Amino acid sequence: MVIDLFRCIGCHACTYACKAENTTGKGVFWTLVFDYERGKYPNVIRSFLPILCMHCEKAPCEQVCPSGATYKRVDGIIAIDQNKCISCKACMVACPYHVRFQNPEGSRAAAEAHQKQERSISRQPGIVEKCNFCKDRIEWGIAHGLTPGVEWDANPACVNACPVNARTFGNLDDPDSEISRLISTQKGEVLHEEFGTSPSVFYISVGRPLPSRIRMR
């Protein structure tokens, strides 16, 4: 995913779309938009920074999970098998971006993710949750011949909801994809490269230094 910080207006449409799509519990946010200030008075500028799971190539959360609940899929998405999660919260401690939440109540809801598909979302109490790039939408789209990052029904909900098209989704392994083009031509950069986790979420912020530290929780 690529997020263009020049386009983001801090409207939180992505946050609301995520909660509606994934029926996350109270106080559980798989994506959030932070606002921060740059510069010094009187030349101060307010900026916005959307945060979500970075789906790292070298994910610390996967490395520390004792039960194998956290795993990396073939497509690079870091996912959680709730049937294996033992609620130890080791992954929450290990994640340097602090984008994992433990849902104490669990949830059960029927969500209409697509016009042609209804699915039941059920989560057990105490299970750790996070952004999964709306993998159910991606899988449904691919199964119906759609291309993630191109067709609406195969995109994460946050991408579709953004009114200014600040988010772009696609295949990082395809050099001809729109997301690869943006990273190359717009100098996409990752948040906290010094962590050495090789995130799959890039930001376009040429000339705008990313904040040194922001926590979701």
Predicted regions mapped to residue ranges:
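Non-ligating segments of multi-cofactor redox enzymes
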Residues: M1-R217
